[in-house]
């Protein structure tokens, strides 16, 4: 059962993949992620390799600021009791020669509502190093940067904040990998993150509703269960070691120190064995029924399964909430059990693993389920015995004998039927036709993955223990519902079989269950294989397959997963269809996106109040990101262009809205300083405030240039279509003007532009006139636009009203999705095309210089893939039969650096043109999903401010340090 150590890899919600490196001589931890090459193909980013060794906490700090990382400082250590002590870390030269060891397990904080940015790394000796992504001692960084928070060397915890630097192969290091075959009794067997108190949204199923002739999904908000840390805690986690030692780590929100509490598991009947056990398996499970954590162990010495419950008292002081007390922990031994030696047929069984599942979704019986895995000796089979761990149920007749006075007919007799003792209630057996190499659970323990030794993987649903890939087989309708889908595999999608499993180091099902991640022992990088259906020729299955993929994507979005695994699975499936029939592939994409809008509960034709919420929501970005990725498949770029336009417009709206709010704040600050009785701002401080205010305006100049150019581009397309209505290359404008989402976004931007213009006109910068040039230039850009924005706004509002009236007269559920996805008007609704062309000519073009519009330079919008990606990679780089993820060795030699994929001309977030200095200072970031390159979040160079000053300004919010406008992850180039 130990053939695959699947705990040596962890795929974060953010998209980062951390895995152990057992071959390298200069590192033992790798960080990689999937990055887009050209919008269609992607690859694993070359791994950053780190060396995690027991003396890492002794390395001197490079910075003494100590801020930004969970408040932890680099100069204190906390002993293994509750109270912290302070000491100075040892010198790096203390050990002339040091060793590092193999990593035994890696754990991102992905559980429940946690964000997936903290990483617990455990080596085979039992040392645990806590890391965080996206933070440094000096503040926020990109997510691909790691910083150590503290290190636990089994007996002592060392608080030491230090940013980790990737190792290079040729560095002269005194660190040496030490291989050992010994099994240490301090090795961490399992690690569990405690959830925060935030609830999550869980998708339960989707089904076809015959009453409305479309698929509907059911989701519910789920509160955390078991033990979760209160808001005054930053995090909490616990681990179980081979010797039965339980370590509990935590940090208060107002504290710099990380603390640890240590307990020992032991059987009360044999206390002398305390700390001397040698566990083979251990599992920590957050259970739902009594606010506890279940700890399950199997001992080699005793041959017994033991079950314990951990209770945590957070010691909240209700009288003085500001007083924070350390938590108290209590362990209770609840049951011992033995494993079977033979089955019912007398065949010899070899016990191989124990796996425990929580019942996350509240049910009448929320007791955890225990799986005991056995190999059937002499056969290729395995069997899984299922048990329910709960309180002993006492029969009524038995109770009547023991206690005759008990009234068993009483309505409240149910309370007397359960004893305080626990037992394992047998539920059934799963007979598996292949030997099991490993077991894992997915999606909050709702699904169980069995990894077979022949390279196959199967997933069962915990609710009914049916094979997910066969869910729709022989499934009959239930009332008005049919085709009930519970996961992304329900429609018959399967995982590919992994070849040569004996050389595979680990395999894991991806976070959204849309594929498998695995690594061969002597390969540097892992491989990813999306789920698939071998035969895609049956067109009748397109509708249910599209609904299944949409349901899977919504499920991953609700769980805050990055979702690149499911995007790749969708792309691969559509590419297979496109190879047969491209029109059918476009229809499939439209159906998938239509279901996506439906499952997210927003209608593209919603009224204004709801539409305002939709355009500012995170789900809209997730939807447009998928449309962008799927649209990159087709030679007709309208699908991906529309997605990129909506993402860009959303960003422009965000920029103007943010600047307007910050301008108001700066003006109030300066006015209050002048008029109040408090001491006025000093000259330097006053200039700094004035400079920051006007620099906000300056940041809008490239954004405004892009917006003016984009509106001009749309009217250019109107001019072309007016003269040539059948022109196939200039139809994006029909989708932008015809669909309500982009129309609403443009109207919102025009409103924000008027707001900003009114502020800078009413409050010009008079104290430092040179700073007011940014306001003057911004107004000039708007005035000199070839499009009259007032007339244009009136036009869009009229279009809104007329199309809303048209929708009431001729309702159509597919009109808006078709406009949004294909940027085209359905043939049966050609009146919309005629109306848009005629009305825009009468209201917009008639009040402008048509020749000036037609000959305006609208290059550099970067809404098409041709403008975005380098020509050398802007194509399908290998046949789809060879996979959608490219091995770096198969790429053109000149296109192996991430810098070579995207055209480095314009900033993808600020819309500013890169200068030569910016391109050469090695401070560029790229999005792993859409491919945008940006410097947003970094200090602005002095040659790009109004006047050169010593004031450091970043302009764009901290959120753009880590995340792109499409919600992809930014990484440094």
UniProtKB/Swiss-Prot annotation:
GO terms for biological process: cellular response to heat; cellular response to stress; negative regulation of transcription by RNA polymerase II; positive regulation of transcription elongation by RNA polymerase II; positive regulation of transcription initiation by RNA polymerase II; regulation of establishment of protein localization to chromosome; regulation of lipid metabolic process; RNA polymerase II preinitiation complex assembly. It is found in: Nucleus. Keywords: Activator, Nucleus, Transcription, Transcription regulation. It holds the Pfam family Med16_C. InterPro entries: Mediator_Med16, Mediator_Med16_C, Mediator_Med16_N. One of its GO terms (molecular function) is RNA polymerase II-specific DNA-binding transcription factor binding. Component of the Mediator complex, a coactivator involved in the regulated transcription of nearly all RNA polymerase II-dependent genes. Mediator functions as a bridge to convey information from gene-specific regulatory proteins to the basal RNA polymerase II transcription machinery. Mediator is recruited to promoters by direct interactions with regulatory proteins and serves as a scaffold for the assembly of a functional preinitiation complex with RNA polymerase II and the general transcription factors. Belongs to the Mediator complex subunit 16 family. This is Mediator of RNA polymerase II transcription subunit 16. It comes from Candida glabrata (strain ATCC 2001 / BCRC 20586 / JCM 3761 / NBRC 0622 / NRRL Y-65 / CBS 138). The gene is SIN4.
